[in-house]
Amino acid sequence: MLETCRPMDIEARSFEIITELLGDRKLDPENAPVIKRAIHTTADFDYADNLVFSPHAVQTGLEALRAGCDIVTDTQMAKAGINKTILASLGGEVHCFMSDPDVAAEAKSRGVTRAWVSMEKAAQLKKPCIFAIGNAPTALVSLDALMAAELLRPALLIGVPVGFVNVVESKELIIEGGRAPYIVARGRKGGSNVAAAICNAMLYQIRR
């Protein structure tokens, strides 16, 4: 039987259902809004298990957003999915350099991916940034190299690329390196929609 629900109540009801289906699972209160938003976006309850957080990662992200940090993504899809109205009200904006002609030319000349070079370009930004990576493992590898060389210190690193080639390994590189606060989806799952959802979970906490 179909459930009657007013349009403005659908999202709230969805989160009620998510909470019900999680049952007696104990989620860290700081991380729960991010986990539930990822589940809401994907209808995949595996995120209750595979999202891992460095200590106080969400709080660190919230503080950075309140201070007006920018967000860097590795896809236009993730950029499109982030709530730019809230972000702009806090003084931030979203960047994606993947389609920039100079990035494409540099990547071709060096024989590396555009994702790799786009992270190098992002490292030149003057503002603190949250990096939301939902597609390219090489973006994570590039970020790790930049951090190791002390050329970059992300305010928060969201590592949720999806796929098969170097996906698991690149995520573990971020976790094991511990060079920046992180939220990582262990395993092969993730995606640009999940990267955007994690950003939005924090933005909505600020503007709820």
Residues covered by each model-derived region:
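N-terminal glycine-rich anion-binding loops that anchor highly charged ligand groups
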Residues: 26-40
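Long, charge-dense
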Residues: 87-125
